[in-house]
Swiss-Prot record:
<feature type="binding site">
    <location>
        <position position="67"/>
    </location>
    <ligand>
        <name>[4Fe-4S] cluster</name>
    </ligand>
</feature>
<dbReference type="GO" id="GO:0030151">
    <property type="term" value="F:molybdenum ion binding"/>
</dbReference>
<keyword id="KW-0479">Metal-binding</keyword>
<dbReference type="InterPro" id="IPR006656">
    <property type="entry name" value="Mopterin_OxRdtase"/>
</dbReference>
<dbReference type="InterPro" id="IPR006963">
    <property type="entry name" value="Mopterin_OxRdtase_4Fe-4S_dom"/>
</dbReference>
<protein>
    <recommendedName>
        <fullName>Probable dimethyl sulfoxide reductase chain YnfF</fullName>
        <ecNumber>1.8.99.-</ecNumber>
    </recommendedName>
</protein>
<dbReference type="Pfam" id="PF04879">
    <property type="entry name" value="Molybdop_Fe4S4"/>
</dbReference>
<keyword id="KW-0004">4Fe-4S</keyword>
<feature type="signal peptide" description="Tat-type signal">
    <location>
        <begin position="1"/>
        <end position="45"/>
    </location>
</feature>
<dbReference type="InterPro" id="IPR006311">
    <property type="entry name" value="TAT_signal"/>
</dbReference>
<feature type="binding site">
    <location>
        <position position="63"/>
    </location>
    <ligand>
        <name>[4Fe-4S] cluster</name>
    </ligand>
</feature>
<dbReference type="GO" id="GO:0030288">
    <property type="term" value="C:outer membrane-bounded periplasmic space"/>
</dbReference>
<keyword id="KW-0560">Oxidoreductase</keyword>
<dbReference type="InterPro" id="IPR011888">
    <property type="entry name" value="Anaer_DMSO_reductase"/>
</dbReference>
<feature type="binding site">
    <location>
        <position position="59"/>
    </location>
    <ligand>
        <name>[4Fe-4S] cluster</name>
    </ligand>
</feature>
<keyword id="KW-0732">Signal</keyword>
<feature type="binding site">
    <location>
        <position position="99"/>
    </location>
    <ligand>
        <name>[4Fe-4S] cluster</name>
    </ligand>
</feature>
Amino acid sequence: MKIHTTEALMKAEISRRSLMKTSALGSLALASSAFTLPFSQMVRAAEAPVEEKAVWSSCTVNCGSRCLLRLHVKDDTVYWVESDTTGDDVYGNHQVRACLRGRSIRRRMNHPDRLKYPMKRVGKRGEGKFERISWDEALDTISDNLRRILKDYGNEAVHVLYGTGVDGGNITNSNVPYRLMNSCGGFLSRYGSYSTAQISAAMSYMFGANDGNSPDDIANTKLVVMFGNNPAETRMSGGGVTYYVEQARERSNARMIVIDPRYNDTAAGREDEWLPIRPGTDGALACAIAWVLITENMVDQPFLDKYCVGYDEKTLPANAPRNAHYKAYILGEGPDGIAKTPEWAAKITSIPAEKIIQLAREIGSAKPAYICQGWGPQRHSNGEQTSRAIAMLSVLTGNVGINGGNSGVREGSWDLGVEWFPMLENPVKTQISVFTWTDAIDHGTEMTATRDGVRGKEKLDVPIKFLWCYASNTLINQHGDINHTHEVLQDDSKCEMIVGIDHFMTASAKYCDILLPDLMPTEQEDLISHESAGNMGYVILAQPATSAKFERKPIYWMLSEVAKRLGPDVYQTFTEGRSQHEWIKYLHAKTKERNPEMPDYEEMKTTGIFKKKCPEEHYVAFRAFREDPQANPLKTPSGKIEIYSERLAKIADTWELKKDEIIHPLPAYTPGFDGWDDPLRKTYPLQLTGFHYKARTHSSYGNIDVLQQACPQEVWINPIDAQARGIRHGDTVRVFNNNGEMLIAAKVTPRILPGVTAIGQGAWLKADMFGDRVDHGGSINILTSHRPSPLAKGNPSHSNLVQIEKV
């Protein structure tokens, strides 16, 4: 007998004709007491009491927020999602309300396309042909292959792929496969991330860390300048940044200037001024602003003398060449002899010189100024240089380490100190960049420290032979140059085993050899920490909303079973004799030691969330350094802000770099490859940049129908460029370059600079990879490059040149 749920009945469409039929049937029933409706049993069942419950959980995808969810459950199914309803919702102790992604989470949980059983690949990688197997066969296959590869190639041949589909949890997290591998000798690890590879590398040389003031500190500023920062789409929820920016600006009435190729949602209706800029040229703008600040005597010279190295001749390191300091570079007195004037920058950025002068004077006269940058500008082929150049504006004006100022990077967050599931120490010290794993599969033994950024040794001894792919669409969808990656993964004699653990048959899952069905975090117990939470830290104790359906299992159980098969010592080291529930209680207790006012475990199951305010009201990056640089030096060789980096000068002299790959000891502007002035523009005249789309978090939520309908996947194109190509809004267009091509709808809009196009990253690949390979899903990585950036060896996924044609 088919069971109809209340929700299904509510969704059913009722036409006038069907309503009349039902009414007639009802009249007939009244006329005959012997008549029994065929659905009368269902009606009686519906009248019977059904047990309902509500549990606290969280949305834990990689948006930088961790929003509280109240999941209402009936018949072991989530049928209604609330968000944070706790407290009085006063700013500073506000409710952590989810955005539309988190509020649609029941559609992910109840999605018919979720993985249900363990499977093994029976076709080619990427075909998506699998057959169902038992858990024992799956776990035995994984364990046998892992044991064989460790024996034949060593631990350096195993890699855990970057993945953030399950990111904010504690035990529902990539820490679990890390811990397993560290329990059995270690693995080839990585440095950097697809989010922040270039800026994290660059700031480590400049400040010794990548840290900024919390966004609530905008309440203390006079001016907000955002370079490529778009929290209204990337971190738009109550657990994110947009609410803080709005509330803080209400208190300070700060003027806000947005610098971005797109008129993004953060700008829309909120900004005082939008300055559209060519992608990848923010560094040139920053240098021209610096020229105005220096020539008009608006720099904070005492700050530069006391806290910095390399601004001028006085603080230039003794081993540096003469006139190698920043001031000389800006004024044209350095080796290149080019003054970085507003007129020079106007030709590069497309921002008029008079606008640059006006902006510079605003920055120089606003005391303090909150200068920040999102992670978009650094995700270019010159991203390391760009991020340092922007940060220099905060340094020049003395806005570092003070209330209302910032270090020039993305806004930071106070951390209350959640105890994390320990990964254990990795005995293997060799590392590769997060972005170069395809090279490590394809030609790993050719990768060196000076050409490919290998760390821990001069070169890799073995290629990657075993790949863990947990909650990761990076295997194909989120990695640069999909066509190249497809070719690398086709040869299964290179990477001999790929284990996927996921919720859906994503584009990446189709390339796995063994595929395991994971429970979602909302179906498990976990201790979840805030991330982009401003000055209000919080922790969520999530409880499972429903039972495990079909043969889905939690990752901790899966890897405990693998550990058991690898031997009793591995199993004991991995589990320490604890179940997942026991780990959560342990981690809660350790967190409570740091925060005694946090509710105990049983009480927190009821309250769901614990919130705590930053004791200093606002989090200020590098405050201690500013107050006493001798007692609190930065983690740089000099202990100061290194405007001139001797370490970068040495790297520039010793690394193997191509002509268009520049590492500079100063925060100088460098064009980068595949940029606005690349000769390739003669063939592919339009710059293409990516952006984080509000319908998805990377590729998470990319298969939710209501979000797809609300936010269709489109390529943004300016009316001038569209008219030249005969393109109208809504037309299907062909976007292509040497890397690949896609068919996608055109969004013709003046909200993007002429000569520039944009596609929201994270859309699911829909291409016949064994046919024409034309993508119909709008995955930007069919067009991006797998060539890494010079210093961080990170993903330059916003540096692209394309042509667009009407289909």
